Amino acid sequence: MEEAILLNQTSLVTYFRLRGLSVNHKARIAMFSMFLIFYVLTLIGNVLIVITIIYDHRLHTPMYFFLSNLSFIDVCHSTVTVPKMLRDVWSEEKLISFDACVTQMFFLHLFACTEIFLLTVMAYDRYVAICKPLQYMIVMNWKVCVLLAVALWTGGTIHSIALTSLTIKLPYCGPDEIDNFFCDVPQVIKLACIDTHVIEILIVSNSGLISVVCFVVLVVSYAVILVSLRQQISKGKRKALSTCAAHLTVVTLFLGHCIFIYSRPSTSLPEDKVVSVFFTAVTPLLNPIIYTLRNEEMKSALNKLVGRKERKEEK
């Protein structure tokens, strides 16, 4: 009997209302234009990185293999939330179906968790390349790289299935307003008709622990790298420092959000939306900028690719 009641309660809410970004009508045009530009540039920048890495054989190395994965993830991660947000800018009632909300949460956490694992793998790749250069091609051979890629995508999928499963099993029978511009687990579970304290602890121990542990591993990895480079100022070492600085910047931007949102109970703070905007719209745009501006090989390969296209057009 209790299960039947719970099923009926769960089926009462078929749509959620997204509160979105609270702005007046005059600001909507500016906000829409800004995020549309961000999204288009994110697509162009990251797709261009993937094409360049595929096209230029000099970039067929483990580091750029993982970088192409990062660019692909950034495109997908941004696409999960930004197009819906752009449509909702002009909608007075921002609705999302229960199924669409669950789907959005699944892919959001799939790409986010996969990126966390990927950034950790990239830190290990840089550690081996800089601290053990003679063993690099043995340790980071292509078989290992492919296995690592499969492992991090599998880990992201398992994590996302676990969180989504916890969310959809809860009964939703009344409140339907999500205080955000997309569906995310912390905001959705607050709408459940039962006490979610245990679920919140599980989320913190899952997402929060993954974020904190990976961040610590990353910081330790780069600390070891910096210690090994501190007394060497050759051109190759300066290049290595530049690459590590780019990686560390991306790590700080991305994991900072994850730790802020998922390492505490599901309480709304005024800063949550600002952090979420930065996480979903700004960080995927900054990644290609950071990697290309600080990477001479990428800039050279991009110039070569653009130059060849221009010559073809002239012919």
Swiss-Prot record:
InterPro entries: GPCR_Rhodpsn, GPCR_Rhodpsn_7TM, Olfact_rcpt, Olfactory_Receptors. Residues 1-33, 83-101, 165-208, 262-272 are extracellular. The chain crosses the membrane at residues 34-54, 62-82, 102-122, 144-164, 209-229, 241-261, 273-293. GO terms for cellular component: membrane; plasma membrane. Residues 55-61, 123-143, 230-240, 294-315 are cytoplasmic. Its main location: membrane. Keywords: Cell membrane, Disulfide bond, G-protein coupled receptor, Glycoprotein, Membrane, Olfaction, Receptor, Sensory transduction, Transducer, Transmembrane, Transmembrane helix. It is found in: Cell membrane. It comes from the Eukaryota. This is Olfactory receptor 4E1. The gene is OR4E1.
